[in-house]
Curated annotation (Swiss-Prot):
Name of protein: 2-C-methyl-D-erythritol 4-phosphate cytidylyltransferase
Catalytic activity: 2-C-methyl-D-erythritol 4-phosphate + CTP + H(+) = 4-CDP-2-C-methyl-D-erythritol + diphosphate
Family: Belongs to the IspD/TarI cytidylyltransferase family. IspD subfamily.
Site, as annotated: Transition state stabilizer: 27, 34
Swiss-Prot/TrEMBL GO biological process terms: isopentenyl diphosphate biosynthetic process, methylerythritol 4-phosphate pathway
EC numbers on record: 2.7.7.60
Length: 246
């Protein structure tokens, strides 16, 4: 729980994490769910699970999984003595359906922190800020300024314009919300032609402001084989630094 001040009154905020891990590794050319791929002798999903498990302000974790992979997740959870993973729910046909399935089993939480299981290098700081700004603004996400120049092209592949990076954000997770706001949002009828790519897109569509705070460039999503190479090197260097301090 988190102790927060709202309008001069101090209260405890109960915080629940949803980790979405029901995806595939198709873009990487693997037949298995990419969150089970090992980096640094641990499956990708274990990194984010451990980060939320060890965060003092996270009260419970709901994991979203494919039905035929639940036993694999249970093995990881039990063998690492994780106590905060209270429920594993089956994912839906879309990410939005998966999040709804997780939200439906959460009781009495003030803030929900939603994270992609394929982002192993989440930090306590990103989680803490997500909880803080969700309590303050209702909806928030972390993100980083793109390093490359971003341009818009036309249908014939000619550049139309260059965009100002000062106003561009590469959105990451976690994305954090007051529970009531995100629950009501997901239960709102949405035009099927509207492309809802993440939970902040839903908030935008419904007219809610979403606060953006600084993410971390290391908080990558493992999507390609190149991402996997970077992740392996990052873990090696992190372990080398840690070993040099002990």
């Amino acid at each position: 729980m988190t102790r927060i001040e709202l309008k001069g009154v101090w209260k405890l905020s109960k915080n629940c994490a949803i980790i979405v891990a029901a995806g595939k590794g198709s873009r990487m050319g693997f037949d298995i769910n990419k969150v089970f791929i090992e980096i640094g002798e641990k499956p990708i999903i274990q990194y984010s699970l451990e980060c939320f498990e060890s965060h003092p302000d996270i009260d419970e974790i709901v994991l979203v999984a494919k039905l035929n992979e639940i036993e694999k997740f249970q093995h990881i959870i039990k063998s690492n003595n994780m106590k905060k993973v209270k429920k594993i729910v089956v994912g839906g046909n879309t990410r939005r359906e998966s999040v709804v399935n997780a939200l439906s089993v959460i009781k009495d939480s003030d803030v929900v922190v939603i994270h992609d299981g394929a982002r192993p290098f989440i930090s306590h700081d990103l989680i803490s800020k997500g909880i803080k700004y969700a309590n303050k603004y209702g909806a928030c996400t972390c993100g980083v300024t793109p390093k490359d120049t971003i341009k818009v092209k036309d249908k014939l592949n000619f550049i139309k314009e260059s965009l100002n990076r000062d106003f561009l954000i590469s959105v990451q997770t976690p994305q954090s919300f007051k529970y009531k706001l995100i629950w009501e949002g997901h239960n709102h009828k949405i035009d099927e032609n509207i492309n809802i790519t993440d939970d902040t897109s839903l908030m935008e569509y419904l007219g809610h402001n979403v606060f953006v705070y600084n993410g971390e460039y290391t908080n990558i999503k493992i999507t390609t084989k190149e991402d996997l190479i970077f992740a392996e090197e990052f873990v090696k260097k992190f372990n080398n630094v840690k070993n040099s301090l002990t």
